[in-house]
Amino acid sequence: MSYNIVLMTAPNKEEAVKIVRTMLEERLIACANIMDPVSSFFWWQGKIGEEKEVLVIMKSHETLFKKLSKRVIELHSYDTPEILALPIVNGSPSYLDWMKACLEPVK
């Protein structure tokens, strides 16, 4: 079983919570952490930008990433939301078993 940590930023905590709750209700993530605020620096429309944002760290299964990503894009207010998946290389067996039980059935 291959699990991912999915990183996403949002403009504010309210939007982050809305997206996280939807992901949980649809069983696309097992859990999430919201870090508020973070300072983000980026290129946008030819200029360097800086914003206070909210960082969301979600735990999921790699086979759910396409659904998760599509759903985040539907719910997110940004034109180009950050949605990045990093593989979980290892974890405690009991935690990974708990994650498996929380997620929609994966193949």
Give residue spans per PLM region.
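Positively charged, small/polar-rich N-terminal and surface patches that mediate targeting and assembly
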Residues: M1-K107
